Each structure stands twice: as C-alpha cells, then as structure tokens.
C-alpha cells in the first residue's frame, strides 16, 4: 500500500479561502491524499474577525496556525510580519513534511510561506499566477511566487502567456 500524499494548502484571507474551498473539499475526497491546512494572516486576526473559525465551522481541520501579523501595516511592519511568517512556516513545514505546498494569489503572507517551502525543498504549486494588479506590490509578489513555484495553475490563456514570459512552464 502506498502512503498518502500530503498536500499542504496555505490560506491567509477570507477572499482567497473562498476560492480554495472546493479545492480543499476535492483534496479531502481523495483517499490517497492528506489535506494539511495551514492558516495564517487575517484568519488569525481579531481585527479581521478571526475567520479561521469559519474554516473550522466548514468542517476543515487546521493542521497548523502561523500567527504572523503585526498591528502595523507600514512597510517596516509588513517586512517584520513576513519575517515572523517565515519562522512560523519553517516550523510548520518541519512538523508536517508536506509533499507539496499549494497557494493561491499574491499576498505577502504567501511570500513568507513560499520562501520557507523553497528553503526546505518542498515543491510549490501556485494558483492565479500571471495576472496583473497595476500599481500594487501584490503584482510583484505574484510574479515572485510564480518564479518560486514548480507547478502553475492559471485562469486564462493570457496569464499562461505571462507565466511563460517569466521563464516558467505552465503545463
């Protein structure tokens, strides 16, 4: 009997969790896969409603929580939060030893998650690479995540082309 493949999914906001919901359900429905859900960012913030509770109410087990948000959204605050996140994700991945880390989007929490996965040698799958958010730091983070990722799930041919322009193979 082969062992179950561990799929670590990172979620940091209610908006991106909504997009991940059916993917999480699909992973759980496959007997050869083990969902390892890691919550971080706004999900763990009083200011944003502690939305990890909704994830639990939806029936998902949370494998690990990475509390990384400081109460400051200045450049220094975001930078420090990212550093705290890298430490937390390093601990999470050491404990969980995933076969792959799946993430969606372009938020700075994912930069911490991807950096820790990259250093630990865990492959990264990124959903929604190649998209554009003009005038936003999120676009740069999305492109960095695309470069760090081993597997790419894009939403349109235009985004597939952009992923290829970044030197990646979106197949």
Cite the ranges covered by each PLM segment.
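Short, well-structured alpha-helical segments in soluble
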Residues: 84-97
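Active-site-proximal region of nucleotide-activated glycan assembly enzymes
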Residues: 122-171
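N-terminal phosphate-binding or glycine-rich loops at protein starts, especially the Walker A/P-loop
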Residues: 2-41
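Structural motif
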Residues: 6, 99-100
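Conserved nucleotide-sugar phosphate-binding/catalytic loop shared by glycosyltransferases and other
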Residues: 33-81, 88
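Helix N-cap/beta->alpha junction signal
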Residues: 13, 106, 156-158
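An aromatic- and histidine-rich active-site surface loop
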Residues: 102-119
């Amino acid at each position: 009997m082969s062992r179950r493949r561990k799929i670590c999914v990172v979620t940091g906001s209610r908006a991106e969790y909504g997009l991940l919901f059916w993917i999480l359900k699909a992973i759980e429905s496959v007997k050869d896969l083990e969902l390892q859900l890691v919550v971080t960012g706004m999900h763990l913030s009083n200011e944003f409603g502690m939305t990890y509770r909704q994830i639990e109410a939806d029936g998902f087990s949370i494998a690990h929580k990475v509390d990384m948000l400081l109460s400051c959204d200045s450049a220094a605050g975001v930078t420090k939060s990212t550093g705290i996140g890298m430490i937390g994700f390093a601990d999470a991945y050491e404990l969980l030893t995933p076969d792959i880390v799946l993430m969606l989007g372009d938020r700075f929490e994912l930069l911490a998650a991807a950096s820790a996965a990259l250093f630990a040698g865990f492959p990264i799958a990124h959903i929604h690479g190649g998209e554009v958010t003009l005038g936003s730091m999120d676009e740069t983070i999305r492109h960095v995540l695309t470069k760090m990722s081993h597997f790419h799930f894009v939403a349109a041919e235009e985004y597939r082309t952009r992923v290829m322009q970044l030197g990646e193979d979106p197949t």
